[in-house]
Amino acid sequence: MKIHDCCSTADGLVVGVQRHEAVSQHCAQRAVEAVSGVLGRYRFGGSLRLRLQRIMFADDGIVAQLNYRSPRVTVRIQVPIVAEDGIEAIADRLDCHIRRQLTGRPLRSWPDPQRPVVGFVSECRPITRRKRFHLMVLEPHIAAAVMDTFDFDAHLFIDAETGQDAVVYWAGPLGVRLARQSKMAPLSTAGMMTVNPIPTLCLSEQAAIQRVCMYGLPFLFFTDVRDGRGRLLYRRYAGDLGLVQGRATAPGR
C-alpha cells in the first residue's frame, strides 16, 4: 500500500512524498527535513517529489528516489539506505548533484560507494515496469552527462554517430562505457569512455529475462528479435524487472 503526503516549507518549496506502508511516517519526515535543509541553503524554491519504498531483498532496506525541479537546476537521485540510519545519504547525494550542476564539474566517480550494483541470481522474475520513450539522438558523451544528471545506472538513447540504439553505463576503466548494437565505429570523442567491442546480443524478451536472472546481471542491453530495436532490461530494487524501449523508429536504418 502506498501513502501520499504533501507539504510546503517556509522558503516556498513544495514537497510531495510517496511512501510504502512499511516505511514509517517518522522516517519520511526525517528525509524531508534533511533534503529541505540542503535546498534551503540554495534558496531555489521549486518542487520536490520523494518516494520511499522497501527493498525486498535486503533486511531494513529502503530505496529513496528524489525528483527536484527549480528554475536553476533539475535533479533526480536514487539511493538505497539501511533503515533510518542512512537518511543523511539522501541529502548528501542531492547536495553533490546540485553542486556539480552549478559548477560544471565532471561526471561522478565510479565505482560509486552509495550505489552498489543491483544484481543477483534469482528465478525468472516478471517485468513490472515498462517505459516507452521517444529516444533522444545524442552524442555518446552527452548521453553520459544525461545519465549522470538523472542518476541512472545505464541510459538508452540513439547514437548520433551511428544512428543505432545504444546505451552508456558505469564501468571501468574510465568510469563510463558505451555499447552499440552492431556498428563498432571509433568514438569521435576519444578518451571520454571505452566502447564495448562485442556486438549486442539479439534476443527475445523472455531470453533476456532468463539471462539477467540466471547470471545475476544488474541490466542487459539487447536487440529485440521482433523489431531490431535496442532494449534496456534492468533489475529493480523491488526485485522484479523493468524494461526501457524507444517509441519512434531510429534514424539511419
Briefly describe each language-model feature range.
Residues 1-253:
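N-terminal, polar/charged subdomain of small-to-medium soluble alpha/beta proteins
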